[in-house]
Amino acid sequence: MAQSNKELEKLAYEYQLLQAQAQLLAQNLELLNLARAEVQTVKETLENLKKIEEEKPEILVPIGAGSFLKGIIVDKNNAIVSVGSGYAVERSVDDAISFLEKRLNEYDDAIKKTQQALTELEKRLGDVAKKAQEIQQKQAMGSFKVKK
């Protein structure tokens, strides 16, 4: 009986650790999806910019709290794109779109790996819970034995 209780404590601890890891992975997955959506929006914006015939189109520049300023795109053939670590480079719109497509593929890979890891953790959580339940059932059955 004491051995069973120690095993249950161990399983409970393992379950808590796995739950914490799963929660972190779920949060990471959410952040990856948000970042991917932002990159997708930028890519679509650049693709739409290419379709505009005006040389210097007028735009609305967001300044926060749902407020905007009117602006003019001075150079619609080039975009300044973040390359990470606080650095940005100027690229042609076509190059910027290609760069963003690569970044989207990287996000897709990271999302897929994170989903797989989360699925694996959820399976392990189920296995640990099942094992704990089996031990509890054995303990319950042991206490109901009829003596002759």
Swiss-Prot record:
Q: Does the record's keyword annotation contain Ligase?
A: no
Localization: Cytoplasm
Pfam families (alphabetical): Prefoldin
Where does the source fall among the domains of life?
Archaea
The answer to whether keyword Chaperone applies is yes
What does the entry list under GO cellular component? cytoplasm; prefoldin complex
Broad class of where this protein is predominantly found? cytoplasm
For the biological process aspect of GO, one term held by this record is: protein folding
Q: Which UniProt keywords apply?
A: Chaperone, Cytoplasm
Note the coiled coil stretches, chain numbering.
Answer: none
Q: Which GO terms describe its molecular function?
A: unfolded protein binding
Its quaternary structure?
Answer: Heterohexamer of two alpha and four beta subunits.
Record family assignment: Belongs to the prefoldin subunit alpha family.
What biological function has been recorded for the protein in this entry? Molecular chaperone capable of stabilizing a range of proteins. Seems to fulfill an ATP-independent, HSP70-like function in archaeal de novo protein folding.
This protein is called what?
A: Prefoldin subunit alpha
Species assigned in the record: Pyrococcus abyssi (strain GE5 / Orsay)
The primary gene name is pfdA
